[in-house]
């Protein structure tokens, strides 16, 4: 004979009904519940994907956006390294953008999206700005019109990064004497690999 507790559990399970999708290929969604999956054929797959399960968590979110909010000319540090520094971080989800060095450090292997917009102000020189990955240029952008007071070098790219890889902007040609207010540098993890 079934005990009272067992009857209550059976009744609750019957009322809740089965967790199901519309068809066999649709995932089962159990909102607010923990689902434990056991593999009857375990392997030594270190990635944990032997079952074909992809797990996303809040810690997988990675994004940053930094701007230049003042029109100060480059500092001694900028003149020496030619790295383009940003003085205000608007978004830094995951804390992977080092604001002191204006460098993004990849927290995991994945595909990342970057874009930049570097404004030159009252400067008749052509500038070349490059997105650097571990010290090597990936993409560049140019601004060289001598008849305008403000012009921007802009570009964007998707790149594969390994954990610990560093991305930053470098002034490869010209100077930013006059400042670079309104310049931006942003990036985010598109998906992990």
UniProtKB/Swiss-Prot annotation:
Expression sites by tissue: In the Purkinje cells postsynaptic structures. In the cerebellum, cerebellin is much less abundant than [des-Ser1]-cerebellin.
Pfam families per record: C1q (PF00386)
Post-translational modification: The proteolytic processing to yield cerebellin seems to occur either prior to the secretion by presynaptic neurons and subsequent oligomerization or in some other location after release of the mature protein.
Region (Necessary for interaction with CBLN3, and homotrimerization): 62-193
Keyword check for Acyltransferase: no
Alphabetic keyword roster: Cell membrane, Disulfide bond, Glycoprotein, Membrane, Postsynaptic cell membrane, Secreted, Sialic acid, Signal, Synapse
Subcellular location field: Secreted; Postsynaptic cell membrane
Region Essential for interaction with GRID2, annotated ranges: 122-147
GO biological-process terms attached to the record: cerebellar granule cell differentiation; chemical synaptic transmission; establishment of localization in cell; heterophilic cell-cell adhesion via plasma membrane cell adhesion molecules; maintenance of synapse structure; negative regulation of excitatory postsynaptic potential; negative regulation of inhibitory synapse assembly; nervous system development
Any one Gene Ontology cellular component term annotated for this protein: extracellular region
Range of residues in the leader sequence: 1-21
Assembly, per entry: Homohexamer; disulfide-linked homotrimers. The trimers associate via N-terminal cysteine residues to form disulfide-linked hexamers. May form oligomers with CBLN2, CBLN3 AND CBLN4 prior to secretion. Once secreted, does not interact with other CBLN family members. Interacts with GRID1. Interacts with NRXN1 and NRXN2 long (alpha) and short (beta) isoforms produced by alternative promoter usage. Competes with NLGN1 for NRXN1-binding. Weakly interacts with NRXN3 short isoform and not at all with NRXN3 long isoform.
Function: Required for synapse integrity and synaptic plasticity. During cerebellar synapse formation, essential for the matching and maintenance of pre- and post-synaptic elements at parallel fiber-Purkinje cell synapses, the establishment of the proper pattern of climbing fiber-Purkinje cell innervation, and induction of long-term depression at parallel fiber-Purkinje cell synapses. Plays a role as a synaptic organizer that acts bidirectionally on both pre- and post-synaptic components. The cerebellin peptide exerts neuromodulatory functions. Directly stimulates norepinephrine release via the adenylate cyclase/PKA-dependent signaling pathway; and indirectly enhances adrenocortical secretion in vivo, through a paracrine mechanism involving medullary catecholamine release.
UniProt protein name: Cerebellin-1
Organism: Homo sapiens
